[in-house]
């Protein structure tokens, strides 16, 4: 019987880390500081070094990592924050949670990241209507690579907008030598288990080079705490990282650079196999970029047929994302630029198994099934 294929094989990674991981977990348990223990500060230090930033603020999850930045910037009612429509709901959700208005922007068809021309059209629309104040842009580093900040950053500077980079899927990626997490006025990531760098529960982090912002973020994540535990200088949230998760992440970070290389090798084998087919659009990494390949996403003319064939052969797949946020029940009342690309690719994208421990025989099985099905 053919062995089942894992979409993301976290157990293979756990076996690789083995006793080192188990010891780190037990050390955290026996240390007795189970929330914000010393491992959290050590993780923040190592993440700052990895991302090339001055400050890392660990928190409870990737959604909070975005939320606390918007709170620190006093973004709220009457403010507009520009987000891509082709992404996970958290990107727009946090904007609505602070009382601001998400304004949806289309993406580029070949990279799935924010389209600068659509962003400019959305900014012009908001200015012309005069009902909202444009405050920030939140590009998402979708599927593992950064948005094209070489174009987006000048737009933000020209318009006086803050940039909060959502690197939940792209943490570890590079753009012209700059690491995702170290780009923008602030950036965030998620340590949800399925992410390229994930823990064994929920976790997140925010990154910045702004000293004052970092101080405010540290306060907000612990109930708006001041210099004393029971001094509350602002309205905050409860978003502390568990010590055990920090211990796990320290061990995972030690192999993360190598895992990025292994993911790249898998992606290149996929690309080389699919490039010859005129019925498959393989993902493109922008010039000067390196992806962490959080997902390997292709486009095909008949997704349902391919999914059925994959399932019949015991190969998992996923659709990220089947509906643009601007068409979702909870978000369709918010303003949006025209989003023809997102509307179209939601019907054609499909993601294949991708992880560092995907062996060549399994890759070949996936490749052969895809090529035969399309």
List PLM regions with ranges.
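Pyridoxal 5′-phosphate
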Residues: 16, 75, 263
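Phosphate-binding glycine-rich loop
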Residues: 32-80, 94, 104-105, 129, ...
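Conserved PLP-anchoring active-site segment centered on the Schiff-base-forming lysine
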Residues: 67-121, 125
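Helix C-cap/helix->beta junction micro-motif
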Residues: 98, 158-159, 313
């Amino acid at each position: 019987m053919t062995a089942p294929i894992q979409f993301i094989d976290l157990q293979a990674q756990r076996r690789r880390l083995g006793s080192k991981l188990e010891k780190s977990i037990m050390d955290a348990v026996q240390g007795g500081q189970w929330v914000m223990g010393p491992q959290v500060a050590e993780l923040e230090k190592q993440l700052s070094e990895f991302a090339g930033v001055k400050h890392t603020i660990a928190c409870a999850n990737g959604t909070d990592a975005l939320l606390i930045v918007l709170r620190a910037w006093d973004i709220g009612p009457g403010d507009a924050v520009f987000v891509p429509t082709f992404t996970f709901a958290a990107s727009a959700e946090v904007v609505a949670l602070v009382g601001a208005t998400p304004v949806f922007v289309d993406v580029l068809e070949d990279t799935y990241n924010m389209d600068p021309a659509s962003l400019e059209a959305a900014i012009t629309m908001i200015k012309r209507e005069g009902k909202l104040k444009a405050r920030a842009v939140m590009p998402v580093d979708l599927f593992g690579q950064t948005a094209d900040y070489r174009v987006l950053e000048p737009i933000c500077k020209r318009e006086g907008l803050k940039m909060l980079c959502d690197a939940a899927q792209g943490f570890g990626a590079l753009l012209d030598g700059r690491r995702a997490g170290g780009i923008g006025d602030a950036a965030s990531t998620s340590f949800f288990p399925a992410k390229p760098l994930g823990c064994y529960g929920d976790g997140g982090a925010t990154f910045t080079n702004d000293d004052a912002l970092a101080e405010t973020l540290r306060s907000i994540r612990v109930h708006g705490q001041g210099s004393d535990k029971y001094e509350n200088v602002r309205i905050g949230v409860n978003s502390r990282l568990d010590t055990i998760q920090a211990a796990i992440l320290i061990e995972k970070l030690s192999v993360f650079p190598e895992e990025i290389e292994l993911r790249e090798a898998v992606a290149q084998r996929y690309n080389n196999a699919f490039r010859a087919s005129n019925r498959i659009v393989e993902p493109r990494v922008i010039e000067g970029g390196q992806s962490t390949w959080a997902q390997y996403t292709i486009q095909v003319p008949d997704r349902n047929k391919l999914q059925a064939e994959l399932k019949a052969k015991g190969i998992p797949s996923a659709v990220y994302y089947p509906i643009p946020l601007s068409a979702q029940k909870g978000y369709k009342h918010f303003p949006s630029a025209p989003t023809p690309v997102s509307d179209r690719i939601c019907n054609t994208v499909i993601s294949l198994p991708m992880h560092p421990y995907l062996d060549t025989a399994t890759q070949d099985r996936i490749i052969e099934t895809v090529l035969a099905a399309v």
